[in-house]
């Protein structure tokens, strides 16, 4: 849990090697980068709001990692964390985001008209389509570090902004603390709401403190545009619907997101963004667009094909189970999404999903007929 700075000063009574964490069994990006020398160099630094190196790395110390999935192992507590602890974050970002260098510039493109196609994914295979991102509000610390008052202020500001939306975006806010257990579970099962904070990554980073205080979900009247408030990020903005019309999902995502951004700007609270990291978020894995464009797609034959993993890698896509990270695929339904976040734009990332899923559905249809797909295996994108 994040402590006051006085505790960090107290730790300096001990030598760096006495405070250096045991990372011998760890498989995460932080553990690869954090040498005793780097720990020594950064351990007495803190951001203006008092976030320290130990706060940054705690979640990665407590969660050594997954044998197959390389977790990041660190979080930012405020916008300045990425600058004050850049000697740790930069190599992690480079490692995680395909060699993205400290001098590289990120590009943003939220013009939905630049997406080609996307309205023709076969609904017999593509069951639902979803695009999400995160946003952080400038002037507040991030969920691993914020105080109760700060979190409530973020909620108040967000609800005022969201409640002023009109037309297809008119909706209502539902605070977590006024929901019954059943209502909450129903929303989780329908993939509308974030899970209760049982994830060790959330718990160890301090993001679940004071749960469910100042957390909630806002959605428009037909539940196709949702905003989570104060989970892992200040805001998670989601556009989703049943079927395969990714073009429409992306249109709604871009238009709604830009409306929200305008309202926050007018209120004097723009979103955290810079030209190197793009949109600044709590977890380094989400920097850049913060975007995950995903579909639930049925791939009964392709998923058994020996080249399934290789095809995904070549298309720059990743698969998750039906219920998201760490879940199994139910009935051969996979959650397929873009692997990249940083260094390419929103349009480019969703384009990869649209084109890649279309190709995979064509492959699936060929395999159903007992035909070979060897001539369809794509080159590396």
UniProtKB/Swiss-Prot annotation:
CDD domains: creatine_kinase_like (cd00716). The modification Phosphothreonine is found at residues 166, 180, 313, 322. One of its GO terms (biological process) is response to heat. Residues 11-98 form the Phosphagen kinase N-terminal domain. ATP binds at residues 128-132, 191, 236, 292, 320-325, 335. Keywords: ATP-binding, Cytoplasm, Kinase, Nucleotide-binding, Phosphoprotein, Transferase. It holds the Pfam family ATP-gua_Ptrans. It is found in: Cytoplasm. Its EC number is 2.7.3.2. One of its GO terms (cellular component) is cytoplasm. The modification Phosphoserine is found at residues 164, 178, 199, 372. One of its GO terms (molecular function) is creatine kinase activity. It catalyses: creatine + ATP = N-phosphocreatine + ADP + H(+). It is an enzyme of class 2 (transferase). InterPro entries: ATP-guanido_PTrfase (IPR000749), ATP-guanido_PTrfase_AS (IPR022415), ATP-guanido_PTrfase_cat (IPR022414), ATP-guanido_PTrfase_N (IPR022413), ATP-guanido_PTrfase_N_sf (IPR036802), Gln_synth/guanido_kin_cat_dom (IPR014746). Residues 125-367 form the Phosphagen kinase C-terminal domain. Dimer of identical or non-identical chains, which can be either B (brain type) or M (muscle type). With MM being the major form in skeletal muscle and myocardium, MB existing in myocardium, and BB existing in many tissues, especially brain. Reversibly catalyzes the transfer of phosphate between ATP and various phosphogens (e.g. creatine phosphate). Creatine kinase isoenzymes play a central role in energy transduction in tissues with large, fluctuating energy demands, such as skeletal muscle, heart, brain and spermatozoa. Belongs to the ATP:guanido phosphotransferase family. PANTHER family: ARGININE OR CREATINE KINASE, CREATINE KINASE M-TYPE. This is Creatine kinase M-type.
